[in-house]
Protein backbone atom coordinates (compact mmCIF):
# COMPACT_ATOMS: atom_id res chain seq x y z
CA UNK A 1 0.00 0.00 0.00
CA UNK A 2 1.30 3.45 -0.88
CA UNK A 3 1.92 5.35 2.34
CA UNK A 4 -0.49 8.24 2.80
CA UNK A 5 -0.19 11.62 4.45
CA UNK A 6 1.66 13.40 1.65
CA UNK A 7 2.42 16.91 2.90
CA UNK A 8 5.36 19.04 1.89
CA UNK A 9 7.52 20.64 4.57
CA UNK A 10 6.01 23.89 5.81
CA UNK A 11 8.84 25.92 4.30
CA UNK A 12 7.79 24.80 0.82
CA UNK A 13 4.61 26.86 1.03
CA UNK A 14 6.32 30.21 1.49
CA UNK A 15 6.17 33.03 -1.04
CA UNK A 16 8.34 32.36 -4.06
CA UNK A 17 9.57 28.98 -2.80
CA UNK A 18 7.69 26.79 -5.26
CA UNK A 19 5.89 27.21 -8.53
CA UNK A 20 2.16 27.41 -8.02
CA UNK A 21 -0.34 24.76 -8.98
CA UNK A 22 -2.67 25.58 -11.88
CA UNK A 23 -6.29 24.89 -10.91
CA UNK A 24 -8.83 24.75 -13.72
CA UNK A 25 -12.30 26.26 -13.62
CA UNK A 26 -14.12 23.02 -14.39
CA UNK A 27 -17.83 23.26 -15.16
CA UNK A 28 -18.74 26.80 -14.06
CA UNK A 29 -22.30 25.83 -13.10
CA UNK A 30 -21.01 23.01 -10.90
CA UNK A 31 -19.27 23.04 -7.54
CA UNK A 32 -15.75 23.69 -8.86
CA UNK A 33 -15.85 27.47 -8.29
CA UNK A 34 -17.40 26.93 -4.84
CA UNK A 35 -14.58 24.58 -3.86
CA UNK A 36 -11.81 26.84 -5.15
CA UNK A 37 -13.15 29.77 -3.15
CA UNK A 38 -13.74 27.69 -0.04
CA UNK A 39 -10.30 26.08 0.08
CA UNK A 40 -8.55 29.42 -0.46
CA UNK A 41 -10.41 30.77 2.58
CA UNK A 42 -8.85 27.93 4.61
CA UNK A 43 -5.36 28.17 3.07
CA UNK A 44 -3.64 29.05 6.34
CA UNK A 45 -5.52 26.57 8.48
CA UNK A 46 -4.84 23.78 5.96
CA UNK A 47 -1.30 24.94 5.07
CA UNK A 48 -2.12 24.57 1.38
CA UNK A 49 0.42 24.85 -1.42
CA UNK A 50 -0.02 28.02 -3.50
CA UNK A 51 -2.32 27.76 -6.50
CA UNK A 52 -4.03 29.98 -9.01
CA UNK A 53 -7.29 29.34 -10.82
CA UNK A 54 -7.72 29.88 -14.56
CA UNK A 55 -11.13 31.54 -14.70
CA UNK A 56 -13.24 34.63 -15.33
CA UNK A 57 -12.54 36.85 -12.28
CA UNK A 58 -15.94 38.54 -12.47
CA UNK A 59 -17.70 35.19 -12.42
CA UNK A 60 -15.72 34.12 -9.36
CA UNK A 61 -16.54 37.40 -7.64
CA UNK A 62 -20.25 36.86 -8.26
CA UNK A 63 -20.05 33.30 -6.94
CA UNK A 64 -18.18 34.43 -3.83
CA UNK A 65 -20.89 36.99 -3.17
CA UNK A 66 -23.59 34.36 -3.59
CA UNK A 67 -21.79 32.12 -1.08
CA UNK A 68 -21.23 34.96 1.37
CA UNK A 69 -17.46 34.57 1.19
CA UNK A 70 -15.05 37.47 1.49
CA UNK A 71 -12.47 36.46 -1.09
CA UNK A 72 -10.20 39.16 -2.52
CA UNK A 73 -9.34 38.28 -6.12
CA UNK A 74 -6.37 39.46 -8.16
CA UNK A 75 -5.73 38.95 -11.86
CA UNK A 76 -2.14 37.73 -12.09
CA UNK A 77 0.36 35.97 -14.28
CA UNK A 78 1.46 32.50 -13.10
CA UNK A 79 4.81 33.89 -11.95
CA UNK A 80 3.05 36.31 -9.58
CA UNK A 81 0.64 33.75 -8.14
CA UNK A 82 2.74 32.19 -5.38
CA UNK A 83 3.82 35.49 -3.77
CA UNK A 84 0.22 36.75 -3.90
CA UNK A 85 -1.42 33.58 -2.59
CA UNK A 86 -1.35 34.47 1.10
CA UNK A 87 -3.31 37.69 0.65
CA UNK A 88 -5.49 37.15 -2.45
CA UNK A 89 -6.86 34.34 -4.57
CA UNK A 90 -4.72 34.56 -7.71
CA UNK A 91 -6.72 34.33 -10.95
CA UNK A 92 -5.14 33.89 -14.36
CA UNK A 93 -7.96 35.49 -16.32
CA UNK A 94 -9.78 33.92 -19.23
CA UNK A 95 -10.81 36.12 -22.12
CA UNK A 96 -14.14 34.27 -22.21
CA UNK A 97 -16.85 35.63 -19.91
CA UNK A 98 -18.97 33.08 -18.05
CA UNK A 99 -22.68 33.61 -17.43
CA UNK A 100 -23.88 30.14 -16.35
CA UNK A 101 -26.04 30.07 -13.23
CA UNK A 102 -25.02 27.64 -10.46
CA UNK A 103 -26.82 24.35 -10.82
CA UNK A 104 -27.96 24.95 -14.40
CA UNK A 105 -25.99 23.16 -17.10
CA UNK A 106 -25.35 25.64 -19.90
CA UNK A 107 -23.48 24.75 -23.09
CA UNK A 108 -22.36 28.37 -23.38
CA UNK A 109 -19.89 27.71 -20.54
CA UNK A 110 -18.11 24.89 -22.42
CA UNK A 111 -15.61 27.16 -24.24
CA UNK A 112 -14.42 28.61 -20.93
CA UNK A 113 -14.11 25.17 -19.33
CA UNK A 114 -12.00 23.90 -22.24
CA UNK A 115 -9.93 27.08 -22.47
CA UNK A 116 -9.13 26.80 -18.77
CA UNK A 117 -7.74 23.30 -19.27
CA UNK A 118 -5.72 24.40 -22.30
CA UNK A 119 -4.18 27.32 -20.42
CA UNK A 120 -3.32 25.25 -17.35
CA UNK A 121 -1.64 22.57 -19.46
CA UNK A 122 0.24 25.20 -21.45
CA UNK A 123 1.48 26.78 -18.22
CA UNK A 124 2.72 23.53 -16.71
CA UNK A 125 4.43 22.45 -19.93
CA UNK A 126 6.13 25.85 -20.12
CA UNK A 127 7.38 25.46 -16.55
CA UNK A 128 5.23 28.29 -15.17
CA UNK A 129 3.16 25.94 -13.00
CA UNK A 130 4.24 22.94 -10.97
CA UNK A 131 1.24 20.75 -11.77
CA UNK A 132 -2.33 20.82 -13.04
CA UNK A 133 -5.32 20.21 -10.76
CA UNK A 134 -8.59 19.94 -12.65
CA UNK A 135 -12.02 20.73 -11.29
CA UNK A 136 -14.80 18.43 -12.55
CA UNK A 137 -16.40 19.05 -15.94
CA UNK A 138 -19.83 18.07 -17.24
CA UNK A 139 -19.17 15.75 -20.16
CA UNK A 140 -22.69 16.06 -21.51
CA UNK A 141 -22.32 19.85 -21.69
CA UNK A 142 -18.99 19.51 -23.50
CA UNK A 143 -20.34 16.89 -25.90
CA UNK A 144 -23.30 19.07 -26.88
CA UNK A 145 -20.85 21.88 -27.57
CA UNK A 146 -18.77 19.62 -29.85
CA UNK A 147 -16.04 18.29 -27.54
CA UNK A 148 -14.64 15.18 -29.24
CA UNK A 149 -12.64 13.48 -26.48
CA UNK A 150 -14.14 10.89 -24.10
CA UNK A 151 -13.02 12.85 -21.06
CA UNK A 152 -10.42 14.94 -19.26
CA UNK A 153 -7.72 12.28 -19.41
CA UNK A 154 -7.84 11.79 -23.17
CA UNK A 155 -8.00 15.55 -23.76
CA UNK A 156 -4.82 16.04 -21.74
CA UNK A 157 -3.05 13.48 -23.93
CA UNK A 158 -4.31 15.31 -27.02
CA UNK A 159 -2.89 18.60 -25.73
CA UNK A 160 0.49 16.96 -25.11
CA UNK A 161 0.42 15.55 -28.65
CA UNK A 162 -0.38 18.99 -30.08
CA UNK A 163 2.53 20.51 -28.16
CA UNK A 164 5.16 17.80 -28.64
CA UNK A 165 4.05 15.49 -31.43
CA UNK A 166 4.29 12.55 -29.04
CA UNK A 167 1.45 10.05 -28.75
CA UNK A 168 0.80 9.03 -25.16
CA UNK A 169 -1.47 6.56 -23.43
CA UNK A 170 -2.64 8.24 -20.24
CA UNK A 171 -3.67 5.96 -17.38
CA UNK A 172 -6.21 6.84 -14.71
CA UNK A 173 -5.32 5.96 -11.13
CA UNK A 174 -7.59 6.63 -8.18
CA UNK A 175 -5.42 7.16 -5.11
CA UNK A 176 -6.12 7.36 -1.40
CA UNK A 177 -4.02 6.51 1.67
CA UNK A 178 -6.09 3.33 1.98
CA UNK A 179 -5.98 2.10 -1.62
CA UNK A 180 -4.76 2.91 -5.13
CA UNK A 181 -6.61 1.40 -8.09
CA UNK A 182 -6.20 1.54 -11.86
CA UNK A 183 -8.98 0.48 -14.25
CA UNK A 184 -7.41 -1.08 -17.35
CA UNK A 185 -10.57 -0.36 -19.34
CA UNK A 186 -12.51 2.70 -18.31
CA UNK A 187 -15.83 4.04 -19.62
CA UNK A 188 -17.18 1.05 -21.52
CA UNK A 189 -20.42 -0.89 -21.37
CA UNK A 190 -19.77 -4.25 -19.71
CA UNK A 191 -20.47 -6.11 -22.95
CA UNK A 192 -17.64 -4.18 -24.68
CA UNK A 193 -14.98 -5.07 -22.13
CA UNK A 194 -14.41 -8.49 -23.67
CA UNK A 195 -13.66 -6.85 -27.04
CA UNK A 196 -11.26 -4.27 -25.60
CA UNK A 197 -9.34 -6.20 -22.97
CA UNK A 198 -6.06 -7.76 -24.12
CA UNK A 199 -2.80 -8.96 -22.64
CA UNK A 200 -1.04 -6.11 -24.44
CA UNK A 201 -3.32 -3.52 -22.83
CA UNK A 202 -2.76 -4.95 -19.36
CA UNK A 203 1.01 -5.04 -19.85
CA UNK A 204 1.15 -1.49 -21.19
CA UNK A 205 -0.96 -0.25 -18.29
CA UNK A 206 1.17 -2.12 -15.76
CA UNK A 207 4.39 -0.68 -17.16
CA UNK A 208 3.08 2.89 -16.98
CA UNK A 209 1.82 2.39 -13.43
CA UNK A 210 5.08 0.84 -12.24
CA UNK A 211 7.14 3.59 -13.87
CA UNK A 212 5.17 6.44 -12.31
CA UNK A 213 5.05 4.77 -8.90
CA UNK A 214 8.85 4.78 -9.07
CA UNK A 215 9.40 8.24 -10.49
CA UNK A 216 6.64 10.19 -8.78
CA UNK A 217 5.64 8.23 -5.69
CA UNK A 218 9.21 7.28 -4.83
CA UNK A 219 8.67 3.52 -4.62
CA UNK A 220 11.83 1.62 -5.46
CA UNK A 221 9.99 -1.64 -6.15
CA UNK A 222 6.28 -1.09 -6.81
CA UNK A 223 4.03 -4.08 -6.16
CA UNK A 224 1.08 -4.56 -8.49
CA UNK A 225 -1.93 -6.75 -7.79
CA UNK A 226 -3.74 -7.79 -10.97
CA UNK A 227 -7.43 -8.58 -10.62
CA UNK A 228 -9.06 -11.35 -12.56
CA UNK A 229 -11.92 -10.53 -14.90
CA UNK A 230 -14.32 -13.31 -13.96
CA UNK A 231 -15.62 -14.41 -10.55
CA UNK A 232 -12.84 -16.14 -8.58
CA UNK A 233 -10.44 -15.29 -11.44
CA UNK A 234 -12.19 -17.82 -13.63
CA UNK A 235 -11.90 -20.89 -11.36
CA UNK A 236 -9.28 -22.50 -13.62
CA UNK A 237 -11.41 -21.89 -16.69
CA UNK A 238 -14.72 -23.15 -15.33
CA UNK A 239 -16.07 -19.57 -15.07
CA UNK A 240 -14.67 -18.20 -18.30
CA UNK A 241 -11.32 -18.55 -20.03
CA UNK A 242 -10.30 -14.87 -20.15
CA UNK A 243 -8.21 -15.01 -16.98
CA UNK A 244 -6.12 -17.91 -18.28
CA UNK A 245 -5.94 -16.64 -21.86
CA UNK A 246 -5.53 -12.88 -21.30
CA UNK A 247 -4.76 -11.88 -17.72
CA UNK A 248 -2.31 -14.62 -16.69
CA UNK A 249 -0.07 -14.15 -19.77
CA UNK A 250 0.01 -10.41 -19.07
CA UNK A 251 1.15 -11.02 -15.50
CA UNK A 252 3.86 -13.35 -16.80
CA UNK A 253 5.08 -10.67 -19.22
CA UNK A 254 5.20 -8.05 -16.48
CA UNK A 255 7.22 -10.39 -14.28
CA UNK A 256 9.58 -11.09 -17.18
CA UNK A 257 10.14 -7.34 -17.49
CA UNK A 258 11.16 -7.11 -13.84
CA UNK A 259 7.87 -5.72 -12.51
CA UNK A 260 6.53 -7.18 -9.26
CA UNK A 261 3.07 -8.31 -10.35
CA UNK A 262 0.73 -10.93 -8.90
CA UNK A 263 -2.42 -12.35 -10.41
CA UNK A 264 -4.92 -12.93 -11.69
CA UNK A 265 -6.41 -12.54 -8.22
CA UNK A 266 -10.00 -13.05 -7.21
CA UNK A 267 -11.39 -9.52 -7.00
CA UNK A 268 -13.74 -10.36 -4.14
CA UNK A 269 -10.82 -10.90 -1.74
CA UNK A 270 -8.33 -8.24 -2.93
CA UNK A 271 -9.52 -5.21 -1.06
CA UNK A 272 -9.72 -6.07 2.63
CA UNK A 273 -7.14 -4.47 4.90
CA UNK A 274 -4.71 -7.38 5.12
CA UNK A 275 -4.74 -7.91 1.36
CA UNK A 276 -4.18 -4.21 0.65
CA UNK A 277 -1.00 -4.25 2.71
CA UNK A 278 0.57 -6.65 0.20
CA UNK A 279 0.52 -4.33 -2.83
CA UNK A 280 0.90 -0.68 -3.82
CA UNK A 281 -1.67 -0.50 -6.61
CA UNK A 282 -4.40 -2.78 -7.92
CA UNK A 283 -4.95 -3.12 -11.65
CA UNK A 284 -8.62 -3.86 -12.26
CA UNK A 285 -10.12 -5.05 -15.51
CA UNK A 286 -13.05 -2.63 -15.69
CA UNK A 287 -14.38 0.60 -14.24
CA UNK A 288 -16.62 -0.55 -11.40
CA UNK A 289 -14.23 -3.28 -10.28
CA UNK A 290 -11.78 -0.46 -9.47
CA UNK A 291 -14.04 2.36 -8.36
CA UNK A 292 -16.45 0.53 -6.06
CA UNK A 293 -13.77 -0.45 -3.51
CA UNK A 294 -12.00 2.91 -3.44
CA UNK A 295 -15.23 4.88 -3.20
CA UNK A 296 -16.33 2.59 -0.39
CA UNK A 297 -13.08 3.13 1.51
CA UNK A 298 -12.31 6.76 0.61
CA UNK A 299 -15.38 8.40 -0.86
CA UNK A 300 -14.58 11.93 0.31
CA UNK A 301 -10.81 12.02 -0.04
CA UNK A 302 -9.81 9.87 -3.03
CA UNK A 303 -7.87 11.65 -5.78
CA UNK A 304 -7.83 11.02 -9.52
CA UNK A 305 -4.22 10.97 -10.78
CA UNK A 306 -3.33 10.75 -14.46
CA UNK A 307 -0.23 8.64 -15.03
CA UNK A 308 1.80 8.57 -18.23
CA UNK A 309 1.87 12.34 -18.82
CA UNK A 310 4.99 14.55 -18.86
CA UNK A 311 3.51 16.55 -15.98
CA UNK A 312 1.54 15.95 -12.81
CA UNK A 313 -2.25 16.09 -13.04
CA UNK A 314 -4.64 15.38 -10.20
CA UNK A 315 -8.36 15.93 -9.76
CA UNK A 316 -10.93 15.49 -7.03
CA UNK A 317 -12.72 12.18 -7.38
CA UNK A 318 -16.24 13.54 -7.73
CA UNK A 319 -18.45 15.19 -10.30
CA UNK A 320 -20.02 18.58 -10.81
CA UNK A 321 -22.80 18.12 -8.20
CA UNK A 322 -25.17 20.56 -9.89
CA UNK A 323 -27.75 19.96 -7.17
CA UNK A 324 -25.65 21.71 -4.51
CA UNK A 325 -23.70 24.21 -6.65
CA UNK A 326 -23.86 27.71 -5.24
CA UNK A 327 -25.24 26.56 -1.89
CA UNK A 328 -22.02 26.34 0.13
CA UNK A 329 -22.69 22.68 0.96
CA UNK A 330 -19.98 21.17 -1.27
CA UNK A 331 -17.35 19.18 0.64
CA UNK A 332 -13.82 20.37 -0.29
CA UNK A 333 -12.02 17.33 1.16
CA UNK A 334 -11.22 15.70 -2.19
CA UNK A 335 -9.98 18.96 -3.76
CA UNK A 336 -7.77 19.57 -0.72
CA UNK A 337 -6.34 16.07 -1.15
CA UNK A 338 -5.84 16.68 -4.88
CA UNK A 339 -3.94 19.92 -4.26
CA UNK A 340 -1.71 18.35 -1.62
CA UNK A 341 -0.98 15.27 -3.70
CA UNK A 342 -0.20 17.37 -6.78
CA UNK A 343 2.29 19.43 -4.78
CA UNK A 344 3.93 16.34 -3.35
CA UNK A 345 4.23 14.59 -6.72
CA UNK A 346 5.48 17.71 -8.47
CA UNK A 347 8.13 18.21 -5.80
CA UNK A 348 9.28 14.61 -6.20
CA UNK A 349 9.46 14.63 -9.99
CA UNK A 350 8.25 17.70 -11.86
CA UNK A 351 8.83 16.41 -15.40
CA UNK A 352 8.74 12.70 -16.17
CA UNK A 353 10.58 11.72 -19.37
CA UNK A 354 8.24 10.25 -21.96
CA UNK A 355 8.72 6.59 -22.73
CA UNK A 356 10.15 5.90 -26.15
CA UNK A 357 7.45 5.04 -28.64
PLM ranges: what are they?
Residues 51, 153, 170-171, 179-182:
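Small-molecule pocket liners
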Amino acid sequence: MIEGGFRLPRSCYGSGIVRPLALTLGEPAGIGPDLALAVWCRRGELDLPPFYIVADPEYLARRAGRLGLNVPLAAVTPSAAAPAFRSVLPVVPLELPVTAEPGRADRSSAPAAVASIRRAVGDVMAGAAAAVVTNPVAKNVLYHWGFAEPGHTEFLAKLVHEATGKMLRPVMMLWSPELAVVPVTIHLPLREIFNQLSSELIVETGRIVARDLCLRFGLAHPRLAIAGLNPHAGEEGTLGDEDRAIVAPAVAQLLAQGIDARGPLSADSMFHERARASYDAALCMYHDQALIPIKTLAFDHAVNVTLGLPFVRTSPDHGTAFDIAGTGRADPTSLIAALRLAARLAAAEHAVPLAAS
